[in-house]
Amino acid sequence: LPIVVEISHRDVYREGLICNFFVRNVPLRFNPEQMTKYLEVSQTLKTKLGMFNFNFGILTNAAGRGDVNAIIGMRAVTGRKKLLFDAPQRLEAACKIINMHAEQKIIVFSETIDLCESIANAVKQGASRPVFVFHSQLTTDEKKNVIKEFGAIDNSVLCCVKALDEGMNVPSASVGIIASGSSTRRQFIQRLGRVIRGVKGKTAYLYQLYFEGTKDRDWLMSRTADMDATIYNI
């Protein structure tokens, strides 16, 4: 589609459509055992992908036709993502950030239902604040009720998966945590947009958790490349 209007976030801020915000990148580290598994599965993926000219599309198509090497390669893709997305360090870091913002409305974004549920359960056990989950396994009515209740309570926490990236408007949400994310810039912008809606006097924070020395960092750099904002590495 053609670009009709192009505007920077600073211009949108001056118009009062978004609030002042900060993006903070939070590095995590694998323990030696985790890193060994990560390197092993990455090497398997590299080897199998090399058999298909390092073309992921060709690899995917070959796996669909039953090619054994391609299937192993696709399993390596899935295995690496699981190691990255569901690592317990994400749970610990997300809970610490949630505790730092005890009085604010928070949205936690995850790539998997397992991580989403784990964070929600941990927060429920450790704090006396409302916690909700939102993902594809909920019915349409359940999703509507979750959004309604989350929006009505000031210090509530919403743990969600990809299903929430588009179409939700809760202006009072001021903290976002990307507990796990992809390389997709559009997804990042949608997630950022959930917490920077313009409200007078509001300052928003978006935290991005990522594992150093892994593909996770590459995905973060890809989705935030050339972003017109201040990003803090902490």
Which residues does each PLM region occupy?
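Short glycine-/polar-rich loops that comprise or flank the Walker A/P-loop
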Residues: L1-I3, I18-V23, A127-P130, P171-V175, ...
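Interdomain helical connector at the RecA1-RecA2 junction of SF1/SF2 helicase-like NTPases
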Residues: L1-E103
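Cofactor-binding loop segments of dinucleotide-utilizing enzymes, especially the Rossmann-like FAD-
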Residues: E111, S136, G181, L209-F211
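Alpha-helical scaffold elements adjacent to nucleotide-binding pockets in ATP/GTP-utilizing enzyme cores
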Residues: K37, Q187-R191, R223
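Alpha-helix N-cap/helix-start capping motif
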Residues: P32, P88, I113, V161-K162, ...
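A short beta-strand element within the Helicase C-terminal
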Residues: V157-C160, E166-S182, Q187-F188, T203-L209
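Conserved segment of the helicase C-terminal RecA-like domain
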Residues: R194-R223
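Conserved helicase ATPase core of P-loop NTP-dependent helicases/translocases
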Residues: K105-F109, D114-K124, S128-D165, Q187
